[in-house]
């Protein structure tokens, strides 16, 4: 399908099942955290109805369409230009029957879905609180990185309302927010079930973490072996190469 790109847009190869992504060169491009989250969530059952909260350019949804047999994924994105870019990626990959964009704030999702109606939720939310960090970035990057339009509690409360009982939220976040996240998950009856820290090297501090939390589940947390990105020589580890479909 022919896609009309704006001057600031490019098409990148996701190097997985011939999937491609449209990216804004001046905006917020996806990183390894999204790729690892898509792999972490690939256990999502077939025929599932899935939500991607804060879909950005749609990379998580595109990858999950390739990695799972989900029935439908809805990508929620508040920024109109990012939502339009995500739609271009959907068109480019001919995924219109499986991936739909909702250009709205996640706090308005009760207008689109009934409570207890979603099989799985994924999210790579803004990592920084609204009052933290330097803000000399473009508006696009500010909204992607800082909790300006919705905070972490909004993401968790919305997930709790919309998920069916015993269905799961998959999220990637930064270690400094782990205590906040655990408190909010417990508050909204989302039980942390699986946690994996991601490190650049074996001897480095965690860079971010991947977490699965299940609605109304019993309390039992499985902490997995850390995921190491690089060997000591700076090359990717075998696990990362496998995730990137290189081996």
Predicted regions and their residues:
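SAM/dcSAM-binding transferase cores
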Residues: 205-247
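General small-molecule cofactor/ligand-binding pocket signal
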Residues: 22, 100-102, 193-196
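Conserved Class I SAM-dependent methyltransferase catalytic core
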Residues: 149-206
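Short glycine/threonine-rich catalytic loop with a Thr-x-Gly-x-Asp
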Residues: 28-30, 56-57, 203
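Class I SAM-dependent transferase core
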Residues: 2-44
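Residue-level signal for inorganic ion chemistry
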Residues: 37, 124, 155, 213
């Amino acid at each position: 399908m022919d896609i009309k790109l704006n001057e600031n847009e490019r098409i990148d190869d996701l190097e997985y099942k011939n999937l491609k992504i449209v990216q804004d060169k001046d905006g917020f491009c996806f990183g390894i955290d999204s790729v690892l989250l898509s792999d972490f969530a690939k256990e999502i059952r077939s025929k599932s109805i899935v939500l991607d909260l804060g879909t950005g350019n749609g990379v998580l949804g595109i990858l999950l369409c390739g990695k799972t047999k989900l029935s439908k994924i809805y990508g929620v994105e508040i920024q109109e230009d990012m939502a339009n870019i995500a739609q271009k990626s959907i068109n480019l990959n001919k995924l219109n029957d499986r991936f739909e964009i909702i250009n709205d704030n996640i706090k308005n999702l009760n207008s689109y879905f009934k409570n207890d109606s979603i099989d799985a939720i994924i999210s790579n939310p803004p990592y920084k609180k609204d009052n933290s960090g330097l803000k000399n970035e473009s508006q696009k990057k500010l909204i992607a990185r800082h909790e300006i339009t919705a905070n972490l509690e909004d993401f968790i409360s919305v997930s709790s309302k919309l998920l069916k009982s015993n269905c799961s939220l998959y999220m990637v976040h930064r270690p400094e927010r782990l205590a906040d996240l655990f408190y909010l998950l417990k508050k909204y009856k989302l039980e942390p079930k699986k946690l994996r820290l991601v490190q650049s090297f074996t001897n480095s501090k965690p860079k971010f973490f991947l977490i699965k939390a299940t609605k109304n589940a019993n309390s039992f947390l499985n902490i997995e072996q850390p995921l190491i990105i690089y060997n000591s020589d700076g090359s990717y580890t075998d696990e990362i190469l496998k995730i990137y479909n290189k081996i």
